[in-house]
A protein has these predicted regions:
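Class I S-adenosyl-L-methionine
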Residues: 1-126
Length: 126
């Protein structure tokens, strides 16, 4: 929601400390990852990382140069990631399209079953 608003406002710089990683965790449908996903703590960490990566890919597809940064010492908080995106008007259309393709591929990989969750994630990329 926050990133969608930042995109709608055409923000030049976006700094986000992401939360709300539960959506992918509840919808994960990827048999290749069952060996990891059967352990709830590892499943959550996998979904956290995948969600943040997809958020960065989505921002890249809108013309932003993106990075995931360590926010503070990991001993202070379990989720210490900050997503940084800086709009780059010089980013080529081809680079934006590649980022969009990578975003869609990630959604389809993690959410195999055709359903509401996959459509929700894909709609964010449009």
């Amino acid at each position: 929601l926050v990133l969608a608003r930042a995109l709608a406002w055409q923000s030049e710089v976006i700094l986000s400390t992401p939360c709300c990683h539960h959506e992918l965790n509840h919808a994960l449908d990827c048999p290749e990852l069952d060996g990891i996903a059967e352990y709830s703590m590892l499943r959550q960490k996998l979904c956290d990382a995948a969600t943040d990566a997809m958020r960065l890919m989505l921002l890249s597809s809108h013309g932003y140069r993106t990075e995931a940064l360590e926010l503070i010492d990991p001993e202070e908080t379990p989720k210490n990631i900050m997503l940084r995106a800086v709009y780059d008007p010089r980013m080529s259309r081809a680079a934006r399209e590649r980022a969009h393709e990578r975003y869609e591929a990630a959604v389809r990989f993690f959410l195999r079953s055709e359903g509401a969750a996959q459509e929700t994630f894909l709609a964010r990329g449009r």
